[in-house]
């Protein structure tokens, strides 16, 4: 378990038993999320739809702390086709948000299966997406930090040594934070498993 903290913004859900209070499902599809399929993890089956179009299901949000903060999770997910995605989100509205996680993009300027950071401003994707090829099927830890108007995405294979994926400058109002999965265009059920979700304040 994490060390005791005096951080007033600290929050952690290890997804054992029931979801902790203050979580809010956006377009919940109860048949496609589970806390029992993989005990100790939240499994969300990646469906179609996009945040920007208000068509994705089972986006899980909670109030963001004020000031600077970092959100973190550990994700098991192996995307295999366009444009499957699962990861963290800092959210103002369907038009203004930042999502960071594992995804798949097969085109000339994409990294294929990899790590991506997508910033949407007024409904339009802001380049770059910092795509880095990543094909390991092992769980990967992800964290997304807000420091003023700087948003930074880092990842780690062991939860100790973190590497930078990318960073964007944004004036969004980070009202909510949480987990997101979607953008599957075709194919069958594709599970994404989140081992925990954590919030910490930053100086």
Q: How would you label these PLM feature ranges?
A:
Residues 1-203:
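Extracellular glycan-recognition regions
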């Amino acid at each position: 378990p994490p060390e005791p903290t005096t951080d007033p913004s600290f929050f952690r859900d290890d997804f054992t038993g029931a979801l902790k209070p203050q979580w809010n499902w956006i377009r919940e599809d109860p048949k496609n999320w589970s806390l029992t399929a993989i005990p100790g993890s939240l499994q969300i089956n990646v469906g179609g739809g996009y945040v920007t179009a208000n068509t994705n299901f089972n986006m899980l949000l909670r109030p963001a702390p004020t000031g600077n903060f970092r959100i973190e999770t550990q994700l098991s997910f192996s995307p295999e086709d366009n444009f499957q995605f699962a990861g963290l989100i800092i959210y103002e509205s369907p038009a203004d948000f930042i999502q960071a996680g594992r995804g798949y993009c097969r085109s000339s300027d994409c990294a294929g299966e990899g790590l991506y950071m997508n910033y949407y401003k007024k409904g339009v994707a802001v380049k770059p997406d910092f795509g880095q090829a990543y094909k390991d099927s092992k769980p990967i830890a992800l964290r997304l930090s807000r420091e003023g108007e700087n948003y930074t995405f880092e990842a780690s294979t062991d939860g100790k040594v973190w590497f930078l994926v990318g960073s964007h400058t944004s004036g969004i109002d980070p009202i909510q934070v949480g987990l997101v999965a979607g953008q599957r265009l075709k194919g069958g059920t594709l599970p994404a498993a989140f081992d925990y979700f954590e919030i910490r304040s930053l100086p």
